[in-house]
Regions:
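Small-residue-enriched hydrophobic alpha-helices in membranes
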Residues: 1-229
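Conserved small/polar residues in nucleotide/adenosyl-binding loops
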Residues: 230-235
């Protein structure tokens, strides 16, 4: 069953708690547990559902960060997920509810951070989607930068990693050295090792095993393709 069937069909068979559970509960009729600060359930199903609702919520609030939600930002979000046509209205309902205000995004981010390791490839992929939404209408605004920095901090990424993402999406998305976190004078063998490491870190099988839904893995592979193609643009 697709992730959408698990979420909107009410067949997941578990209680989804916390802020994300509250968001899902606005229409799904699930029982919602009071959120506590203990470690959340670690089953893959729970991670997938939390991750998917978290994507919708954070993407909507990302788009709202500068006060204006553009059609480019909505399109960028839709490009990041495989959404069944019959579930599109449900997804839009969560999106529209979350985008009413930028406030509260930290609670969604913290709940996701409890499910995955700090600086994990899954959280990194989510950050990539948020960056792609931010830049989709031409530039990353000051408000969007502040939003992204706060989410990045909650997810456990250091300042160096955040600055790298800013550099990639603002200026050098096609620069192989920036993407591979290398310098032009680095030995080619060293650069190739970094490429292989990044590809292994973001391999679809690895991401799915950690709890990332297939519907996200299959669509949100722009970064992986970018890393793969760097060998074509290196001297």
């Amino acid at each position: 069953m697709s992730i959408w069937g698990k979420i909107f069909g009410g067949t997941s068979g578990f209680v989804l708690g916390g802020p994300l559970g509250g968001l899902l509960g606005i229409f799904a009729g699930h029982a919602i547990d009071k959120f506590n600060r203990k470690k959340l359930p670690e089953s893959i199903a729970v991670k997938q559902v939390n991750f998917t609702i978290g994507i919708i919520a954070l993407s909507a609030k990302m788009a709202k960060a500068d006060g204006i939600v553009s059609h480019q930002e909505l399109d960028a979000f839709k490009k990041g997920l495989i959404i069944n046509q019959n579930e599109l209205k449900n997804v839009e309902k969560v999106w529209n509810f979350a985008k009413q205000s930028v406030h509260g995004f930290e609670s969604y981010a913290r709940q996701l951070a409890k499910l995955f390791k700090p600086n994990s490839s899954i959280l990194e992929n989510l950050i990539h989607l948020l960056f792609s939404i931010a830049i989709s209408d031409g530039k990353i605004t000051v408000e969007e930068t502040e939003f992204l920095k706060k989410v990045s901090d909650i997810f456990g990424f250091d300042k160096k990693k955040f600055n790298l993402l800013i550099e990639i999406y603002s200026n050098n998305e096609n620069d192989p050295y920036t993407i591979l976190q290398s310098n032009i004078n680095d030995p080619i063998d060293q650069i190739n090792k970094k490429r292989i490491t990044l590809l292994k870190r973001h391999h679809p099988d690895v991401l799915i095993a950690k709890g990332q839904p297939l519907e996200f893995v299959e669509k949100n592979n722009h970064y992986v393709k970018t890393v793969s193609y760097t060998h074509l643009t290196l001297p």
